Regions:
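Local beta-strand N-terminus motif with an aromatic residue
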Residues: 55-56
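Class I SAM-dependent methyltransferase SAM/SAH-binding core
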Residues: 2-47
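Short catalytic micro-motifs in class I SAM-dependent methyltransferases
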Residues: 62-65
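Core SAM-dependent methyltransferase catalytic element
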Residues: 150-172
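Short alpha-helix
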Residues: 115-137
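A conserved beta-strand element that flanks and buttresses the S-adenosyl-L-methionine
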Residues: 59
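Conserved class I S-adenosyl-L-methionine
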Residues: 86-115
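A short glycine-rich, Lys/Arg-flanked "PGG" loop and its adjoining helix->strand segment in the class I
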Residues: 71-83
Length: 172
């Protein structure tokens, strides 16, 4: 189907996943994504420059923590999704050892300095308030960064893993 990555950044995820369309407000990042072949609109997640029901799925990877108004951004994602379209959110769960590590160190991080981390439950609650059907949550990264020596497993659910993938479906 036709997908959109909101907060496409440099196109690091969109390009290998074959997502040709992205939204990114940061000029330098948008330029890098364009070099990877992504059609990037320099816009904000809270005001997407697309018509209603334009996409089969919307992807947001480590983007929700940078949004001024996550609920408004999710409303916009819902608006541009076709009926039964999927929203897929990859996020750092604030309520995990990994998330707490990031929260503590964010002032020293170039990338996460301005981040406002959320818990998976908060994001699921926002999705429910917008009448999305909860499809699935999966989690990984069960240790602090210092303790990880190999690829961490993926498990269903959320609440333990530091990185959570949430998939929810727009009602028909």
């Amino acid at each position: 189907g036709i997908g959109l990555e909101v907060g496409v950044g440099t196109g690091r995820f969109a390009a290998p996943l074959g997502i040709g369309m992205g939204v990114e407000p940061a000029k330098a990042m948008a330029e890098m994504a364009r070099k990877r072949g992504i059609d990037v609109h320099e816009a904000r997640a809270e005001a997407l420059p697309f018509g209603d029901e334009s996409f089969d799925f919307v992807l947001m990877v480590t983007a929700i923590c940078f949004l001024e108004n996550p609920l408004q951004a999710l409303k916009e994602a819902k608006r541009v999704l076709k009926p039964e379209g999927l929203i897929i959110i990859g996020m750092i769960d604030r309520n995990s050892p990994f998330g707490r590590d990031y929260e503590r160190k964010k002032t020293a991080s170039k990338f996460y300095k301005r981040a406002n981390f959320h818990s998976a439950d908060e994001v699921l609650s926002m999705l429910r308030s917008l009448n999305f059907d909860h499809v699935a949550t999966h989690q990984t990264i069960f240790k602090s960064l210092k303790e990880i020596s190999a690829v961490e497993p993926f498990e269903e659910g959320h609440g333990k893993g530091g990185f959570v993938a949430i998939a929810a479906k727009k009602r028909a």
